[in-house]
């Protein structure tokens, strides 16, 4: 039987081996956002903040402009 390979039978016993050192992954590590994604979120937040401040300031600035035009 020197060069022949033994055919694997379907009823052979299979052994499970576990690694001695276990690597643990936290859910936060897996779902952590990349720097490009964090930059996109920051950019979106900044745009929303600008829009909300513009809404507040435009009323005040337009009122002041109208007062100056009346004088």
Curated annotation (Swiss-Prot):
What is the superkingdom listed in this entry's lineage? Viruses
Some GO term, biological process aspect, for this entry: which one?
regulation of macromolecule metabolic process
User: Matching InterPro entries, A to Z?
Assistant: PPP1R15, Prot_Pase1_reg-su15A/B_C
Region entry Important for host CHOP inhibition, spans: 16-18, 57-61
Q: Which UniProt keywords apply?
A: Host-virus interaction, Inhibition of host innate immune response by virus, Inhibition of host interferon signaling pathway by virus, Interferon antiviral system evasion, Late protein, Modulation of host PP1 activity by virus, Viral immunoevasion
Q: What does the record note about the induction of this protein?
A: Expressed in the late phase of the viral replicative cycle.
**Statement: the UniProt record of this protein carries the keyword Protease:** no
Provide the GO MF annotations for this entry: protein serine/threonine phosphatase inhibitor activity
Q: Which family is this protein grouped under? A: Belongs to the asfivirus DP71L family.
Tell me, what does this protein do in biology? Interacts with the host phosphatase PP1 catalytic subunit (PPP1CB) and recruits it to dephosphorylate EIF2S1/eIF2alpha and therefore restores the host translation that has been shut-down by the host. Also inhibits the EIF2S1/eIF2alpha-ATF4-DDIT3/CHOP pathway.
Q: Tell me the subunit arrangement.
A: Interacts (via C-terminus) with host PPP1CB.
Q: Which PANTHER family match?
A: GH11727P
| Stated name of the protein | Protein DP71L
Lineage, opening ranks: Viruses, Varidnaviria, Bamfordvirae, Nucleocytoviricota, Pokkesviricetes
